[in-house]
Amino acid sequence: MFSLIKFILAMLHTSNDIRNPGLRILPPGVERYFVRGGGLSIIEVLPEDKIEIINEEGRQICEIIVFNSKGKSDLSILNLKENANADFSKKTIANDEKISKLLKNKNLDLNNAKSSIVFSEDCMMGEKITLTSKDKCVVMIAAPGDAMNVHEQNPPTDLTIFLNKAKFIETDEQFILPDPLSDPIIEQLVKRRTAETYEVKAGEYIQIIDPGGRQCSDFLAFDTRKLNDGIESIIDDKATRTFMGGAYPGPGLFSKFYDGDHEAMIEVVRDTVGRHDTFNLACTSKYYEDMGYMGHINCTDNFNNRLDKYDINSRKSWSAINLFFNTAIDANNVASFDEPWSRPGDYVLFRALKDLTCISSACPCDVDGANGWNPTDIFVRTYSKEKKYSKAIAFRMKTDSEPKLTQETGFHKKTSELTRNFVEYKGFWLANNFTNSGTIKEYTACRERAIATDLSPLRKFEILGPDAENLMQYTLTRNVKKLSVGQVVYTAMCYENGCMLDDGTLFKLGQDNFRWIGGDEYSGEWLKEQAKKKNYKVWIKSATDHIHNIAVQGPNSRKILEKFVWTPPIQPSITELEWFRFNIARIDHETGTPIVISRTGYTGELGYEIWCHPKDAAEVWDKVWEAGKEFDITPLGLEALDMVRIEAGLIFYGYEFDDQTDPFEAGIGFTVPLKTKEDDFIGKEELIKRKANPQKN
């Protein structure tokens, strides 16, 4: 299971943040942290500080360990009683070299630590506990849980922590410096309105961090070997845009910056912002003089001064990579800029492809919105080439959500052997097409033979409890009460105005047990909000990280699955499985790897979806591939999937519908049984009006 350990640095969010869009609004002295399900977090606490722990989704125990100033376990500091041996935290940390080293450096004695378990296994959504600290301490908070069997509905889920500081300094600025990715080679603070140089070797990594948010940082990189020969070879923005086919590179296939000799200099590995500039110059004296600000500090002069020691010629302007600079060109060919998208702690991670001499600035512009009207510091770290870092952008479900780096699906190990063309979708890397097939061949294989495609980014939620059916009947347009156990239904999920929030499929696993498979993560938040409003006794548990899936589609898909899918006598076999039904199955035999098979798909062909835990995904892929060789099975990427689903008349958010489209306009009016569903549901009244008076033709 992937590491979910995080050592927390201070994150102060004050009431003044309301002036800065996109930043969290919390009372002065309140900090917010998260504990991922199946992981743990560590925070430093001072006397009289209050810790509020919220069990967001319920049915999740919490393990707490407290270390006093001497590094010894002391639960009494938080008025907690010992009732466990901290087994989960000890096991988790033992498997993580980085956090083990960190605890050792802080002299925290985990081996002899005891813990307190708070929250019951049946606690409700939103249940909370507040603890007050008697003394300075380090608190380790865990959300214990193992990998969820796909036949079960008990994923470990997140906890939210609010730390109310007894003493704090109120400030208008936030400053978040994320933990180092590993042991840094260089740590360089670039103070506001200045620039700093640094050198890296080929293969090493450069992390440029915006600790305060909304701060531009101009970046230059010189080829060190050429520089030693008196040649000033730097990143060429035009060459880069030409070769990469975009305004600037990003993580993935088109990720490199080039010099004027068409040689790659650096590669973008991670980018948590996704908005930069390669069209404009680093700010110059002329820029400010033209606005009437004579003698204003500027990045060009700062660069010239700092680069002088390398005998680099001064220039009137530098064509830099303007990190975090938010620029755009509109439909009328007018260039514009606005405040940066970067938030406190956001960063870009580069990998040097040559020995480089670099310089980074903390732009001094304070006369417009380029730096949010308030220049702040930049922080640079470099890392050894020995450790590899995943390629990623940051995914945020909501504006105040904790950013999540792009993940690899459980099937990525297998699909990455067949292609390098991956695109980011909903926080995951998915194959766009495959190297030895291509879009047309993949499309043809789906229509004539069989394909397998990775659809793991679909959001999964376990809906449990005595009011589970009532909640789904109220929030979905379909008549959920007509579902039998083992049945799947495709449905819309609407707002009160009748427009669509999401579409997806609902699995009925038991009388009070459902599994919602949707396209958007917010659908889970919506379900929680409605459950709270209706005071339903129900749990909505996030399960996306525990259930990944591939679709096996095409005329030969049934024959492929028949070769390796075992089902108990009480379940329908693959041959018997009807349209929009699922079975509880295993691979090969009754003690084989657990899977769920549904006769569903997104292609219009005969097809099935196989659902499994990510740790079992490689085995599932191999089984499908081995069984499919006889039928010339082909992997299918997003490009070909788009072709087959359009031909089949299957809709996709952002294309055929959005939050201003009702189900009738989207072409799925069949999911709204207004005449036969007597119970009320969200949007029903408006949908009756919209059906009688269509808004769009």
What residue ranges belong to the model's regions?
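Intrinsically disordered, low-complexity segments enriched in small/polar residues
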Residues: 2-391
